[in-house]
Structures are given as structure tokens and as C-alpha cells.
Amino acid sequence: MNVQIEESWKTHLQPEFEKDYFRTLTEFVKSEYSQYQIFPPGKLIFNAFNLCPFDKVKVVIIGQDPYHGPGQAHGLCFSVNDGVPFPPSLVNIFKEIKADIGTDAPTTGNLTRWAEQGVLLLNATLTVRAHQAGSHQNRGWEAFTDAAIRALAEEREHLVFILWGAYAQRKGAFIDRNKHLVLSSAHPSPLSAYNGFFGNKHFSRANDYLKANGETEIIW
């Protein structure tokens, strides 16, 4: 199957594209796009991979589902398009960055600039039906994104994996803590941010680790 995805990722994930679950997933996604409003736009499904080639990844942030409101999702977890109001979790992410490293919140919630520096902003599920959170869960995306995380965890070293909330922590449970830095805390959602997200200092801790391993820091 010829999947339109960045070449280095295509090389590493090619075995997934040939599996039965991925063929079934592809048919499901095509059917959904033909019948319903689906986010993100089709050409942006693999945006996280396309902006951040396999060998350029330094940090992985794991999300769950794309935003399901109009104009929000563009293939990067927690990120929204330019001009779109910041969702509550993103507001809290920027608050923690300010508290941690002193950087003021930007004027846009578009995190493409992180992706281009080597931050893989990966949702577990890459598509969603408009206004129906979780509507594309358990259709195969989770197996595919597990494979991407596993490839990075096994074939790269000294990466930072940022796992906010129980869902991301379960998804990253197999990552070798001796080979990578795994940062876990509560989710930035307003429901849980005060239970350990605020004050986690993940942004400075990620940069300290990158620097200690000879990598340039992320400009958060």
C-alpha cells in the first residue's frame, strides 16, 4: 500500500502498511471522509510525521484524539491552526512553560514550530468525526501509532517521551527508561492540571536532558 507519508517514516512503518488492520483502517477512514465531516483535513492526517522526520525526532508528546471542532485540528496533538482560540489544555501548557522557563505565551496555538525542531506531536488516534470525541478510537490507529512509538524507542536513543495523563502513560509503558527520558504527569486539562501538571517542569527537564546528550534544546 502506498501511503503518503514522509519518506523516513515510510521506511520504518512500511510493515504496518501491509498488515490487515491497516487495510481495514484505510477503508474505514476513506468511508468516513466520504460521508461525514472528519478532522483533520485528509492531507494533514500524517502532519506530525511529515513535519518531523524519523531521524530528527528529539521529543515525543503523546496525545489522544484530534480536536473535533471546526478549524482546530491540523494533525499535531494539542496544536490548533493560526487564529483559532486556544483550547483549555493548550492554555495550561503555555502557563506551565511560562512558569518553568519564563517564555510568554505565543500569539498562536499553532505548534508547527515545535514540530520543525524535532518534537513529534503524536495523537494516538489520527482522525475524528466532527463534534464526536473518540469516534475513531479502536479502529486501528492505536496499533499504528504504537508501532511508531516502538520504532523510535527501539531504534533511537536519548529521546524525551512526555506522557501527560493515564492514557498516554499506558501507551508509553513499554519505553526503556534506561535508554530514554520518560516524563510523566497529570494531563494539562483543567480537570487535572492542578493534580500534578502544573509544576512538572517538563520543558526545562527535556531541554536539560537534550543538552546533556549533545542535542540542541527546543525553543518552547
Swiss-Prot record:
Which regions span the lipid bilayer?
Answer: none
Family the UniProt entry places it in: Belongs to the uracil-DNA glycosylase (UDG) superfamily. UNG family.
Protein's UniProt keywords contain DNA damage: yes
Q: What GO molecular functions are on record for this protein?
A: uracil DNA N-glycosylase activity
Location comes to: Cytoplasm
Could you tell me which SMART domains the record lists for this protein? UDG, UreE_C
The enzyme's E.C. designation: 3.2.2.27
> Any one cellular component term from GO for this entry?
cytoplasm
Q: Which HAMAP family match?
A: UDG
Where it mainly occurs, coarsely classed, is cytoplasm
- Keyword set, alphabetical order: Cytoplasm, DNA damage, DNA repair, Hydrolase
Its biological purpose: Excises uracil residues from the DNA which can arise as a result of misincorporation of dUMP residues by DNA polymerase or due to deamination of cytosine.
- From what organism does this protein derive? Bacteroides thetaiotaomicron (strain ATCC 29148 / DSM 2079 / JCM 5827 / CCUG 10774 / NCTC 10582 / VPI-5482 / E50)
Catalytic activity annotation = Hydrolyzes single-stranded DNA or mismatched double-stranded DNA and polynucleotides, releasing free uracil
Q: One biological-process term from Gene Ontology?
A: base-excision repair, AP site formation via deaminated base removal
The record's annotation in NCBIfam families points to: PRK05254.1-1, PRK05254.1-2, PRK05254.1-4, PRK05254.1-5, ung
Q: Which PANTHER family match?
A: URACIL-DNA GLYCOSYLASE (PTHR11264:SF0)
Q: Name the catalytic site residues.
A: 65 (proton acceptor)
Q: What is this protein called?
A: Uracil-DNA glycosylase
